[in-house]
Amino acid sequence: MAKKILVMDDDPTIADLLREALADEGYETFMMTQSLRFYDAVREHKPDLILLDLMMQYLDGRDELKLMQMDDHNIPVIVVTAYLDAGKEEEEFRKAGVVKIVYKPFDLDKLVELVRSIIGGPEGKTA
């Protein structure tokens, strides 16, 4: 069974780019562009990894991380953001499950390799 990745970005172009690149690698991907159903999507799909934009419309990425932390989800999160000060909050993010902060614009191939290094290949194999 393929590993599942939830891609969440309010820019549909970026979300679809990430979703498609990871699906091409063999991962099962789910894309969201609005944060209102984030928590429901996490519970429904039970992803192995989340790619999360910090600056979202209703709930921002920080709120979503707090919701996950309150429910004791142990899902690794890669924050993908244009918010250049995100590094100043790195310790707080790490407590909430963030394993890496990637700044936009990003190198897509390097991001895919980062995903593979965190959760292994789509079927659980390491690179």
State the predicted function of each range.
Residues 106-115:
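C-terminal output helix
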Residues 31, 58-59:
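Residue-level signal for the "D+5" position in two-component response regulator receiver
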Residues 26-33, 41:
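Short hydrophobic/Thr-rich beta-strand motif most characteristic of the beta2 strand and flanking loop
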Residues 16-24:
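Charged docking surfaces used in two-component/phosphorelay signaling
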Residues 45-51:
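Active-site beta3 strand of CheY-like receiver
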Residues 15, 57, 85:
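The feature encodes the CheY-like receiver
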Residues 80-81:
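Hydrophobic/aromatic residues positioned on beta-strands within the core alpha/beta folds
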